[in-house]
């Protein structure tokens, strides 16, 4: 026997038994995003490496340590996307979407980061990304947060809390960066190796460290909110006021920063205590300088990314996963006329496109086929034997109640079948 090939570490299969939670989340996300006027966009999984270096930042962990980068046969450096915002912005610029227009876009798909795999953090992971491009005011920041709050309600999830902060303008952040670096230089002996490295490239990320031995020195660090420019203060105050009026609870977390360099002003995260260390299920913020940074006109924008696997875990924990759809009808062939019965099943699918038909494939005696019908979860079995077909009838046998089978003329089968399925469905749901 040939040696089995396993999945790559940190890249998981989603099997049919688990897919209903994913489909439910994706359907709810599509519904909620659409209700706010967002349109779907699909962008490549692979982009030029330079896109992510320029967008995310040379000194971020993502660019330095986590990207899947390779040189193709033509000598170009390409990267599997570690996040979607840069690709969406690149698509908007490349396709001229931003010429005097504003766009509200969303997409769902896989991202790739070479991290240490653990529950809730994988090397291939899926995200819902929602981006509002061309909108400058705090009202769109508030609407995006309201959209996520509505999605939690639509999914019937509770215990997800919101934290918000402002990173100010790049100019204000540069001033704060110098103050922060000077502070950490005075306490460099208290920093771990990773944080000392970040002092040179991305010192704000030190504030996001989870190292408990650094908690005290981080808690005493200067606050960015004490050094905000006045326009950013006003923007943040309007956002907070809008959230208050909508009844969306939040906590201002002055230590909240984002791991990607393109963020400015508003940043936010939705957190949960139900997933252990991986507590962030949705993160976002404003990136007013990114589009110009990638070669477009100066254009304001804001967006968020939601971790699909983490929200699926919450749905499973909360028992909010709809049952997988079972077949309505299982077609049993008790004889040699499988071709004729296949044709009949196709006609039934034409007549009843909203119903699910499972045809017994691969043969088997009547008893074995009936066991398969029962195991399929179908409400009803259609029994098509040589004798019945010769008389122009088909037998119908309910599988979920103690009712005898009845015969139906083939010419009336679709109508009679639908009538019986409506009755059986109402009994099962009742």
Question: Where do the PLM segments sit?
Answer:
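TRNA-recognition modules of translation machinery and tRNA-sensing kinases, especially anticodon-binding
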Residues: 1-428
């Amino acid at each position: 026997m040939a040696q089995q090939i396993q999945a790559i570490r940190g890249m998981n299969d989603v099997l049919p038994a688990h897919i209903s939670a994913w489909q439910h989340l994706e359907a709810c996300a599509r519904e909620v995003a659409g209700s706010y006027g967002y349109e779907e966009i699909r962008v490549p999984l692979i982009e030029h490496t330079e896109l992510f270096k320029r967008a995310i930042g040379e000194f971020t962990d993502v660019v330095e340590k986590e990207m899947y980068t390779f040189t193709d046969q033509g000598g170009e450096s390409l990267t599997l996307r570690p996040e979607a915002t840069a690709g969406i912005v690149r698509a908007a610029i490349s396709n001229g979407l931003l010429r005097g227009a504003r766009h509200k876009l969303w997409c769902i798909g896989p991202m790739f980061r070479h991290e240490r795999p653990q529950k809730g953090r994988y090397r291939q992971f899926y995200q819902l990304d929602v981006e509002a491009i061309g909108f400058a005011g705090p009202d769109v920041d508030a609407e995006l947060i309201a959209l996520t709050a509505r999605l939690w309600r639509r999914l019937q999830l509770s215990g997800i809390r919101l934290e918000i902060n402002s990173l100010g303008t790049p100019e204000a952040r540069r001033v704060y960066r110098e103050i922060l670096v000077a502070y950490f230089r005075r306490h460099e002996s208290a920093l771990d190796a990773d944080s000392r490295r970040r002092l040179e490239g991305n010192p704000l990320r030190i504030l996001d460290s989870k190292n408990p031995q650094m908690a005290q020195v981080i808690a005493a660090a200067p606050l960015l909110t004490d050094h905000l420019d006045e326009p950013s203060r006003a923007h943040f105050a309007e956002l907070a006021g809008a959230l208050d009026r909508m009844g969306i609870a939040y906590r201002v977390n002055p230590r909240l920063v984002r791991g990607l360099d393109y963020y400015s002003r508003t940043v936010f995260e939705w957190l949960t205590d139900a997933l252990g260390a991986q507590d962030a299920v949705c993160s976002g913020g404003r990136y007013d300088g990114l589009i110009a940074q990638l070669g477009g006109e100066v254009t304001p924008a804001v967006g968020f990314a939601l971790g699909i696997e983490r929200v699926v875990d919450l749905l499973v924990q909360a028992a909010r996963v709809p049952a997988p759809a079972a077949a309505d009808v299982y077609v049993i062939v008790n004889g040699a006329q499988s071709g004729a019965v296949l044709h009949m099943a196709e006609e039934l699918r034409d007549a009843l496109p909203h119903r699910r038909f499972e045809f017994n494939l691969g043969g088997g005696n009547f008893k074995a086929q009936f066991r398969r019908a029962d195991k399929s979860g179908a409400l009803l079995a259609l029994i098509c034997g040589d004798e019945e077909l010769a008389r122009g009838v088909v037998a119908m046998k309910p599988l979920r109640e103690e009712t005898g089978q009845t015969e139906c003329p083939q010419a009336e089968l679709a109508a009679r079948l639908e009538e019986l399925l409506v009755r059986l469905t109402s009994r099962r749901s009742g």
